[in-house]
């Protein structure tokens, strides 16, 4: 399948106000993909590409993370291309690996097992109007448009903590996070609602599930450095892995203690060397 050569990259405050990690990540997509159009989005130019599907009063209630989730599915549904989170670092040109994994017209790194439909959302690639991403966009928008939620605060936290005891026990029970009783009675949703709804979209439609299963799985390795701690000392083992470029993309974080950022740490090697 043909993925349009567009890379979508969002930082609301603009590039000049972005932290070092975000600036370096943006530069990495430009450096390794000179034949791709890298589109930097911020709050000033976002409406040049999409009109938010949610009413303003609903959209303003959502966290920036959820707004970003809505933006990515709207952009990919309308234009296709690659969504790269602002803290995702490109290490291998997209032309060198992505096409092999886009038989479904969509690609995402897989979380543990493909059968459950769980994906990572920080890197997504789709063709324009891909049926899976279109259905996801419609479903995700409707979830927030057609329901009234406690978006934060003590009530929401208590209810979510209670529901987690039952709904997070197994993969299969997570589908009930978007059920009528949770939406209309408890009026809350968990942090990973995007991922749970995506899995529901896949598993509730035979044709979409069939299409999804044609996507060659690539089990996520991009956040493997996180388990070591990005500010920990760079060992020979980690350096060898980074230098091998076996991982095409890394998921980083811009939230770290500046005093711990030094030439001996993993993050410094990724960004500066």
Which residues are covered by each model-predicted region?
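Small-residue hinge/turn detector
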Residues: 69-81
């Amino acid at each position: 399948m043909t993925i349009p050569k567009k890379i979508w990259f969002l930082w609301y405050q603009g590039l000049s106000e972005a932290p070092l990690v975000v600036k370096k990540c943006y530069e990495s997509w430009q450096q390794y993909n000179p034949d791709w159009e890298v589109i930097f989005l911020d709050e000033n130019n976002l409406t040049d590409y999409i009109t938010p599907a949610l009413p303003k009063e609903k959209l303003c209630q959502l966290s920036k993370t959820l707004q970003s989730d809505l933006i990515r599915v709207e952009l990919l549904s309308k234009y296709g291309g690659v969504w790269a989170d602002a803290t995702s670092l490109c290490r291998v040109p997209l032309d060198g690996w992505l096409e092999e994994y886009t038989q479904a017209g969509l690609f995402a790194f897989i979380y543990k097992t493909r059968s459950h439909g769980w994906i990572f959302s920080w890197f997504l690639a789709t063709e324009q109007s891909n049926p899976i991403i279109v259905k996801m966009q419609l479903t995700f928008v409707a979830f927030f448009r057609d329901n009234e939620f406690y978006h934060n605060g003590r009530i929401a936290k208590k209810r979510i903590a209670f529901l987690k005891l039952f709904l997070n026990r197994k993969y299969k029970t997570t589908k009930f996070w978007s059920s009528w009783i949770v939406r209309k009675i408890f009026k809350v949703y968990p942090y990973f609602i995007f991922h749970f709804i995506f899995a529901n979209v896949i598993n509730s439609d035979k044709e979409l599930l069939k299409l999804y299963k044609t996507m060659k799985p690539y089990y996520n390795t991009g956040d493997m450095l996180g388990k070591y701690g990005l500010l920990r000392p760079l060992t020979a083992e980690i350096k060898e892995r980074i230098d091998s470029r076996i991982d095409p993309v890394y998921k980083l974080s811009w939230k770290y203690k500046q005093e711990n950022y030094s030439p001996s740490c993993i993050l410094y090697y990724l960004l500066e060397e």
